[in-house]
Amino acid sequence: MSRYQLCFEALAQKQQGAFVPFVTLGDPDAELSLKIIDALIEGGADALEIGIPFSDPLADGPTIQGANLRALNANVTPTLCFELLSQIRQKHPTIPIGLLVYANLVFSNGVDNFYHKCQQAGVDSVLIGDVPLREAKQFREAALSANIAPIFICPPNADDELLQELATSAEGYTYLLSRAGVTGTDKRAEQSLTHLTSKLKAYNAPPALQGFGISEPQQVSQAISNGAFGAISGSAVVQIIENNLHQPDVMLKMLTQFVQQMKAATISV
């Protein structure tokens, strides 16, 4: 069984959903980035979603673009990121680790080589933010041959055909998009996605984790009551980093507290 399957089964037995924070690796620098990961896990993160710094993150709003720039300015390269990922995996052997990257980064490493590096570093899944499912064949095959789960986005306007394709193509989890657009906390996740989650379950798709606009515990509860297995929060996490760059101890404490609050919202009363 994969780390995702083990994680989700254990949570289901405890009647809990999953809370997954996102950060850009190397933000604001490599050393502090590792402490940030520890703080997120200490707070109760069930899995991690990690970005590799990239100069043109198309799907990201200004908060996560800022994280990319800080990491790039700290000379964080993809090679260093794989070293950091190996360290994270060594310290935290059971937590699922997913990467959110862009196609240029994968191509520049060579597609097969990129997934091989992921496998060597202990990565569990890869989501390529700018490659829709229908263009993903090459990436999916390379992922599966390296024992990496290919993650795909389910948009809020997905039709039946796409939902069935997602169910048969995806592994690990399904990234359920709260809304169209770019990431950020100013555009809240308001739309009910029950019709999508019920169909994804009917088609036996991997568990849905809802992302985009998730910044408050009540949105995590809402995502789960709408049928998602859990929620992913990125911009709200990165905002805490950005707001506390000059007081890292406060930053780490606030990150742990934020995850604790969001995780608490996944627990059935």
Swiss-Prot record:
One of its GO terms (cellular component) is cytosol. GO terms for molecular function: tryptophan synthase activity. It is an enzyme of class 4 (lyase). The keyword Lyase applies. The active site is at residues 49, 60. InterPro entries: Aldolase_TIM, RibuloseP-bd_barrel, Trp_synthase_alpha_AS, Trp_synthase_suA. It comes from the Bacteria. Its EC number is 4.2.1.20. Keywords: Amino-acid biosynthesis, Aromatic amino acid biosynthesis, Lyase, Tryptophan biosynthesis. Belongs to the TrpA family. The alpha subunit is responsible for the aldol cleavage of indoleglycerol phosphate to indole and glyceraldehyde 3-phosphate. NCBIfam families: trpA. This is Tryptophan synthase alpha chain. It comes from Proteus mirabilis (strain HI4320).
